[in-house]
Amino acid sequence: MGRLEGKSVVITGAGSGIGRAASVLFSREGAKLVIVDKTEAVKETAKLVSDAGGTVEAVIADAGSENDVKAFIDKAVAKYGRLDAIWANAGVSGGLVPLAEQTVEHWQEVLRVNLIGPFLAIKHSMPHMIKQKSGSIVCTASVAGLKAGASGHPYGASKAGVISLVQTTAYSLSGTGVRINA
């Protein structure tokens, strides 16, 4: 029996990288998954999980869209009866464009996915978890949110925002049985 046996978990950004690896690992530990990505690649991740005997539902959705986030969280609750954990992992790098050449639209897109996305995941998962008096919320951050480097301006700013969002949310969740980390 795995450490996540029977737990209902949502993972965004599950089409590749950390999200794909987490989906496979969580499934091996017994989690029942709803995995989300904006691309068809999420179906490949679902096949890896399913072929290994895991329980999984793949959803193609935009982790920065409030309607999509609410829908995939509600889908997990409807399918599995509860939501034990969510990992807001979807993100975009934004590239290494000189600041003077960046556009407001470029910044808005990076912030929409990397910061608004985790905010929406928190906003729509918290009520379910508070009602259960348990749950775990994880948001992918980065050292780029703590220290300047070559990661790009909007990326670093978005990850600094995620760190602050998680810290302030942890304070507000005190005593609810729900924990949050980045």
Please state what every model-predicted region is:
Residues S8, G15-S16:
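Conserved glycine-rich cofactor-binding loop
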Residues I60-A71, V104:
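The beta1-alpha1 cofactor-binding region of Rossmann-like NAD(H)/NADP(H)-dependent oxidoreductases
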Residues V97-L99, H106-Q108:
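Substrate-binding pocket helix/loop in short-chain dehydrogenase/reductase
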Residues I122, S158, V166:
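Active-site helix of classical SDR
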Residues P127, Y171-G175:
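Alpha-helical segment proximal to the catalytic Tyr-Lys
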Residues S142:
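Residue(s) in the substrate-gating loop at a strand-loop-helix junction
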Residues Q102, A148-G156, T168:
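Active-site loop-to-helix junction immediately N-terminal to the catalytic Tyr of the SDR YXXXK motif
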